[in-house]
Amino acid sequence: MDLTNNLDAYLNAHLDESIAELCKLVSQTSVSAYKHGLIECSEIIVGLMKKRGFKVQIFSNDVAPIIVAERKGKSNKTLLFYNHYDVQPAEPLDLWESPPFKPMI
């Protein structure tokens, strides 16, 4: 089975779980401008990473905790993801078709 088929099989087998995790993550406010929900959001991410076998380090600062996660694979190659989990303020709320932190599928 090739990589694409393996990935498709994994995603199909874990679709409901993946959707639930994504909904939990995007439901958490993490507005950097207000420093609101950033610690809680980082805790969700840390939990998701640990669940998948990553060794996680958290570096606190005065804005949003920095999360560094590492998991050794079978090869000596490195894959790096660099991302952010904070968002911009959702206002004005009346311009939204649905609540900004309530996922809809």
Residue ranges and their predicted role:
Residues 1-2, 18, 75-83:
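Short charge-dense sequence patches
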Residues 2-36:
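N-terminal capping segment at the start of a domain
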Residues 3-5, 11-12, 46-50, 59-60, ...:
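A short linear-motif detector with a strong N-terminal bias
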Residues 78-105:
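Active-site metal-coordination/substrate-binding segment of hydrolases
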